[in-house]
Amino acid sequence: MILLAVLFLCFISSYSASVKGHTTGLSLNNDRLYKLTYSTEVLLDRGKGKLQDSVGYRISSNVDVALLWRNPDGDDDQLIQITMKDVNVENVNQQRGEKSIFKGKSPSKIMGKENLEALQRPTLLHLIHGKVKEFYSYQNEAVAIENIKRGLASLFQTQLSSGTTNEVDISGNCKVTYQAHQDKVIKIKALDSCKIARSGFTTPNQVLGVSSKATSVTTYKIEDSFVIAVLAEETHNFGLNFLQTIKGKIVSKQKLELKTTEAGPRLMSGKQAAAIIKAVDSKYTAIPIVGQVFQSHCKGCPSLSELWRSTRKYLQPDNLSKAEAVRNFLAFIQHLRTAKKEEILQILKMENKEVLPQLVDAVTSAQTSDSLEAILDFLDFKSDSSIILQERFLYACGFASHPNEELLRALISKFKGSIGSSDIRETVMIITGTLVRKLCQNEGCKLKAVVEAKKLILGGLEKAEKKEDTRMYLLALKNALLPEGIPSLLKYAEAGEGPISHLATTALQRYDLPFITDEVKKTLNRIYHQNRKVHEKTVRTAAAAIILNNNPSYMDVKNILLSIGELPQEMNKYMLAIVQDILRFEMPASKIVRRVLKEMVAHNYDRFSRSGSSSAYTGYIERSPRSASTYSLDILYSGSGILRRSNLNIFQYIGKAGLHGSQVVIEAQGLEALIAATPDEGEENLDSYAGMSAILFDVQLRPVTFFNGYSDLMSKMLSASGDPISVVKGLILLIDHSQELQLQSGLKANIEVQGGLAIDISGAMEFSLWYRESKTRVKNRVTVVITTDITVDSSFVKAGLETSTETEAGLEFISTVQFSQYPFLVCMQMDKDEAPFRQFEKKYERLSTGRGYVSQKRKESVLAGCEFPLHQENSEMCKVVFAPQPDSTSSGWF
């Protein structure tokens, strides 16, 4: 019985796990010439998979394969010769007809005589146990041509038994899995495992990033230990995470078929493959089977200065709200990435002051060593005469998609040196914090420059003596989000003066859930409940928000709810609005809040019926099963009806990944004297102040001040024009993905996705004693352009797919307060402007000689504007504030 079981297992394993035959790989018969046909084709489209919507090309040929030598000591050690003949290049889509770029052109005209000759020269492949030992070709052949031959040769590497292993072929060192059957072998290559040197980068934030998926399956039909047919298919799909309409697909196929065999060259005798190769042709040299990098040369392309002359008109200040400005900004960045320092410096020095800020945006966004050296040489940080340019450079550094240690080192050097403007010095440190976080997210926390920057931030905060320095380092820490900085933030949050305490608390607000430990919550509870000292309302409410948003305990929630009713009137209303917003929006804390509210002591009419005008509301801008865009607006007033803080946030979520798109906070304090009102508890001695702070795409910017001090306030009230103050304005490279792919056919593919925007965020605070009314305005104007460019290049023919998606949008928040009576009237409005939405598509096939086929499409629509809903109480209040005035029918004195 045991013997039968053993025999059965042996039979099953040999039948299912290997192809019939005695070798571990392909084996050629002696003195035979195998004549095959070969073709490789590539298709590009937007993922629809329809041939008529695709662009691409096919390279085909006859192939002769012969065994030159077999090791007398082992059958599985072979040297084979592979020769391509009768090469042809044609369209995959035969519907091109007269539009075909290949029509009437011979292969030598398409490829060039030298390239064609090189492609048809034989290559040698040394196989041991079916795996490539060495690949031999001639020196000084074009890399692109050698890659095509590598792609064909790699098909002959296989094994005839099931299993998983690592192989080196044209794709690199890859993990492959073989599934062997009686007369068939399926080879699955894990393309994401392939180790091959290729340039590329991507945006680390998942929301703004690009997702890709690649597959490779090769099917071998085997007869007598040799292939009678091979079919390989490789696909690359990619898509922009937050906008799924932006996607693309590359399909590469190879097909090899045996047509016949005939008498071939006699087997050469010898014990070493090297001696045989030398005897065949001494000009053969061993080269890597792994695909090599090549660059297609641009013939007659304009210089950087010529390109800039045609681009600069689109980047004039008056044109920045147009999509063509962003489109040209993105295109120019691509040219800057191949430019030398001297070329870049030349155009910087020649430009005028109106266009220079936009040029600085582009040069900094290029993120190359040459562009960084050029901009650092150009900007003089010791002078305060070019503050706008210095600030634009620093913010472009903060928004950098793939910053490196070199950039961080440059900022540290500038900070340690002489800086003419205190505002610029502060901005350098704030952006240093941003770069630390981005490099740490990309596993660069142990880089020397990052370690130095951490010490600079934490050490500077510890030793800071001036209030301005403390604020600077806290803002840097708010961007860096260093776990080791939390104790310092807690210290300043609990013991610091009002503005410093508030800044430290809002910095803690940006940390992820795992960092808001029980110890952190203990300190925040002490701040909220004022166990050790009296705190301003802004600090207390920020502390409560952190507790409620980070897995609060039952007692945390209960104590906060019990405090409602005992707080100053407007803070009471604000905290009540926060709790109601948690319940209405089904935030994570909503379940535990509902549990606590079941207790009568926490949930009673007296506690939840207090009047006031402060509010908090969260809503959806857009929602789908995989993503969501949310907005939140909360406003806290003083007891006298004057704004203390308004906070407008926009978030984008994809799955569990999030992006803090924007935050605009307007703060005011110490304005009660203007209307002879009594300040709230703990705020009796505050200086008059109003200012604005912004976070943009996860980067905290340097706050701006409307006025500081009573005399400054009065002078600005008397001379006020109502014009908004800009917080940030410029061109930003937001999405930046570049990927170079080595297709197993030997062709080279590139995927480029770029997203840029022209942005202008401004704010204003208007105050009228005559009408006893104040208005707060925040305007967001954004023009967004996202471009994709997919190409497959063989050096003599290129196919490409370019798309562009663009829109121009506006979002305005207005808060109107009438404090001529109490309770005062408050109306909040949040409006989104009507926005055009345009999509462009361009597909092309182009020969290196210049002849091309182009197909273009355009689609336009309009996204309707809307007013975002806030709570019902606000709607009722707005009807009163903006009640229609009765028509006057009197025409005389009486």
UniProtKB/Swiss-Prot annotation:
Changing residue 435 to H: In ABL; no loss on localization to the endoplasmic reticulum; inhibits triglyceride transfer activity. GO terms for molecular function: apolipoprotein binding; ceramide 1-phosphate transfer activity; cholesterol transfer activity; lipid binding; lipid transporter activity; phosphatidylcholine transfer activity; phosphatidylethanolamine transfer activity; phospholipid transfer activity. Keywords: Disease variant, Disulfide bond, Endoplasmic reticulum, Golgi apparatus, Lipid transport, Lipid-binding, Signal, Transport. Changing residue 649 to S: In ABL; uncertain significance; does not reduce interaction with P4HB/PDI and APOB; reduces triglyceride transfer activity. It comes from the Eukaryota. Changing residue 384 to A: No loss on localization to the endoplasmic reticulum; does not reduce interaction with P4HB/PDI; reduces phospholipid or triglyceride transfer activity; does not inhibit apolipoprotein B secretion. Changing residue 528 to H: In ABL; does not reduce interaction with P4HB/PDI and APOB; inhibits triglyceride transfer activity. Residues 1-18 form the signal peptide. Changing residue 189 to R: No loss on localization to the endoplasmic reticulum, does not reduce interaction with APOB or P4HB/PDI, partially inhibits triglyceride transfer activity, does not inhibit phospholipid transfer activity and apolipoprotein B secretion. InterPro entries: Lipid_transp_b-sht_shell, Lipovitellin_superhlx_dom, MTP_lip-bd, MTTP, Vitellinogen_b-sht_N, Vitellogenin_N. Changing residue 540 to K: Does not inhibit triglyceride transfer activity and apolipoprotein B secretion. It catalyses: a 1,2-diacyl-sn-glycero-3-phosphocholine(in) = a 1,2-diacyl-sn-glycero-3-phosphocholine(out); a 1,2-diacyl-sn-glycero-3-phosphoethanolamine(in) = a 1,2-diacyl-sn-glycero-3-phosphoethanolamine(out); a cholesterol ester(in) = a cholesterol ester(out); a triacyl-sn-glycerol(in) = a triacyl-sn-glycerol(out). It is found in: Endoplasmic reticulum; Golgi apparatus. Changing residue 540 to C: In ABL; does not reduce interaction with P4HB/PDI and APOB; inhibits triglyceride transfer activity. Liver and small intestine. Also found in ovary, testis and kidney. Coiled coil: none annotated. One of its GO terms (cellular component) is Golgi apparatus. Disulfide bonds join 174-194. One of its GO terms (biological process) is plasma lipoprotein particle assembly. Changing residue 590 to I: In ABL; no loss on localization to the endoplasmic reticulum; does not reduce interaction with P4HB/PDI; inhibits phospholipid or triglyceride transfer activity; inhibits apolipoprotein B secretion. Changing residue 297 to Q: Does not inhibit apolipoprotein B secretion. Catalyzes the transport of triglyceride, cholesteryl ester, and phospholipid between phospholipid surfaces. Required for the assembly and secretion of plasma lipoproteins that contain apolipoprotein B. May be involved in regulating cholesteryl ester biosynthesis in cells that produce lipoproteins. Heterodimer; heterodimerizes with the protein disulfide isomerase (P4HB/PDI). Interacts with APOB. Interacts with PRAP1. It is linked to Abetalipoproteinemia: An autosomal recessive disorder of lipoprotein metabolism. Affected individuals produce virtually no circulating apolipoprotein B-containing lipoproteins (chylomicrons, VLDL, LDL, lipoprotein(A)). Malabsorption of the antioxidant vitamin E occurs, leading to spinocerebellar and retinal degeneration. This is Microsomal triglyceride transfer protein large subunit. It comes from Homo sapiens (Human). The lineage of its organism: Eukaryota, Metazoa, Chordata, Craniata, Vertebrata. The gene is MTTP.
